[in-house]
Amino acid sequence: MIAEASRLLRPRLALLNGIAAVAGCLLAPEGAAMSLIVASLAGVTLLAAGGSALNQVMERDLDLLMERTRQRPLPTGELSPRAATAIGGISIIAGLVVLAGTGGIFPPLIGVGALAWYLGIYTPLKRRTSCSLLAGAVSGAVPPLVGWTITGGSLVDFRIVLVAGLLYLWQIPHFWLLQCRHAEDYRRAGLPLFAPGVTAGSPVFRVWIGAFAAGTLLLPLFGIIGGSAAPGFCAFPLLLVLLAFSRAEGALFSSLNLFPLLMVLALYLQR
């Protein structure tokens, strides 16, 4: 049961959301206590893991049709939908308790809102339109808001708005490339794909990468990332643009995956 629950919760993917929440903590001008950083990491990771589990319950019919997902515990019958729902619910409740216990009411409320959007808007929309990822990216941009509010930050502060906006921009090419990689799987499951001309090498994709790259440069420009971390951080968006125009999709996908970690590292180095 433990092994199946671990596969259901997808801890590595959930941890990326937790790391993004840490970015929000590290933005705090007066610095964040280690207890708040740990709480943000743990709470958001648990919420993301629980959300992933409930998403798999809702999409178990699709997962059975796709090569990359048919070995998940629900399609294989290793877990029942009821058991998976219970595991996901426990993870979500644990995450909310952690966030409420350290940050008051706002962090868990934001987390609940993100989960409701992800499961109530994105998951059903995924079956209807390829543009569903534009909606799904909203919930993926929320973790830094949780980390920021747990330190007492205001949601209208331009720094957290910029970081959350960058995470939104980052997710689109990331999942775009993922869709291109598994296009046959999506067709097999009957999920809508982007139009044939809209590929990783298309002008609209390059424009999006360019917008994301330009946005990342705003962090050093506004002093959000500075010191010794700034030069290396500025080199990252330039690398993305070069990879996008060279059509090195594998390298571009791998580089995009590093962005949340790179941002957290850069914010940590200037503390």
From Swiss-Prot:
PROSITE patterns: UBIA (PS00943). InterPro entries: Protohaem_IX_farnesylTrfase, UbiA_prenyltransferase, UbiA_prenylTrfase_CS, UbiA_sf. GO terms for biological process: heme O biosynthetic process. One of its GO terms (molecular function) is protoheme IX farnesyltransferase activity. The chain crosses the membrane at residues 31-51, 79-101, 105-122, 133-153, 160-180, 190-212, 228-248, 249-269. It catalyses: heme b + (2E,6E)-farnesyl diphosphate + H2O = Fe(II)-heme o + diphosphate. It comes from the Bacteria. Gene3D superfamilies: UbiA prenyltransferase. It is found in: Cell inner membrane. Its EC number is 2.5.1.141. It is an enzyme of class 2 (transferase). The keyword Protein biosynthesis does not apply. Its main location: membrane. It is a multi-pass membrane protein. GO terms for cellular component: plasma membrane. Pathway: Porphyrin-containing compound metabolism; heme O biosynthesis; heme O from protoheme: step 1/1. Keywords: Cell inner membrane, Cell membrane, Heme biosynthesis, Membrane, Transferase, Transmembrane, Transmembrane helix. Belongs to the UbiA prenyltransferase family. Protoheme IX farnesyltransferase subfamily. Converts heme B (protoheme IX) to heme O by substitution of the vinyl group on carbon 2 of heme B porphyrin ring with a hydroxyethyl farnesyl side group. Carbon 2 of the heme B porphyrin ring is defined according to the Fischer nomenclature. This is Protoheme IX farnesyltransferase. It comes from Geobacter metallireducens (strain ATCC 53774 / DSM 7210 / GS-15).
